[in-house]
Amino acid sequence: MSFIADRVVMDGLTFDDVLLIPAYSEVLPRNVDLTTKFSRNITLNIPMVSAAMDTVTEAKLAIAIAREGGIGVIHKNMTIAEQAKQVQTVKRAENGMIYDPVTITKGKRVADALAMMAEYKIGGIPVVDEGGYLVGIVTNRDLRFEKDMNRSIDEVMTKENLVVTGQSTDMEAAAQILQEHKIEKLPVVDSHNKLIGLITYKDITKAKDKPKACKDSKGRLRVAAGVGVTFNTFERVAALVDAGVDALVIDTAHGHSKGVVDVLKQIKAQYPHIDCVVGNIATGEAAKYLVEAGADAVKVGIGPGSICTTRVIAGVGVPQLSAIYDVAKALEGTGVPLIADGGLRYSGDIVKAIAAGGSSVMMGSLLAGVEESPGDTIIFNGRKFKSYRGMGSLEAMQKGSKDRYFQDVEDDVKKLVPEGIAARVPFKGSLYEVIYQMVGGFRAGMGYCGAHNIEELHKARFTRITNAGVQESHPHDVAITQEAPNYSRGE
């Protein structure tokens, strides 16, 4: 028996190997429905997720992508307290009603109030007594010209004729109250004047500006966070849950392993209300294994990322489009979504990834260059770039991602075996601009396929193409004089 017949079980295809075949269409791109599932219980308004990488997703980017309708996954290359604070920052960025507002106790000093305003980046704080009952509110306006930092806030706060409302007040009524009284913050109290929340003009305005934002039932932006399989995993999980995280992502290089499932089962047993995404995998067998263990979504991609070297260092992986399709077939009927992670270069790749069976895509390099990403800004040859590195790069592993590659027991940096590189990507401007182009391309693809929604896109057909077909697909036989905002062949 030949080697191919005996050991080669499949032909692996990726994005450049295929094109979607256009179909009869009655749908315009602007009218397609982009809603999808991130995990079993979390709905997205666009099928886009930012990667749990330390040069991609921290609070600033997570806030920005949630406002556009996607979700960000805060990376774990930081202390437990820092990651929990990042989650809290996202959860406090927007609210229908703030259920746990920052408060200050009466008797505190002006200096204390100013410090809290600076720490939480807020312009006003409700003042409460020891029992949590509202006694006043102190704002920037009250403190603007105050020179005595030791003066009690009781003397400067607004305490007469306080405008408050009850918990049953809806946002439209709250907006009218704020406008009528020309105030920006509306304390919410119970029948005994105990503070139970806060409604702000800023949050109402943000909700109107971004109606498709990904939010929880309390009107707060959704956010996920990455965790590993290491000695302090459950301490980290507990802190993230306390911080209000919407989903946990067990982020490893090889999700089809006993250690990962052991962690998954423990998390689901302890926190059954928190969705748990597990990855990364590349086969249908792995998907079934994780679903049986309780996964609320699976993340697909072994080595397709631009900064990943797993396939050449370990010799392991499955070309991404085939991996997505294989896992999608295994997930049929389970209700468990598939997140396609890695290998995306253009918006057309996103269309292909979803058409092959994905529910959403996870983006690293496509978002690493935006101004909201935490990567360092670099000027090189007169052009602006941002740093971008794989979580399997030596630099990232030294900072804390060793456990992702099952090397957390290794302290000697010389004995680490990296599966990624450090790089740079061109600066791209704001996340909004990038997402706008990605979503626009995705809508166009759905229109060409005649798909009203993502479920219909899953029925689209592909054609396999040659290298000549790939060359023909790109601009050719011309010199590009001005780049489009959604197309580039590299630096």
Q: Where is each model-derived feature located?
A:
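Bateman/CBS regulatory modules and CBS-like beta-alpha motifs in cytosolic regions of diverse proteins
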Residues: L28-L44, A51-M53, E82-Y120, V127-D129, ...
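Catalytic cores of alpha/beta
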Residues: K60-I63, E235-A243, A282-V300, A340, ...
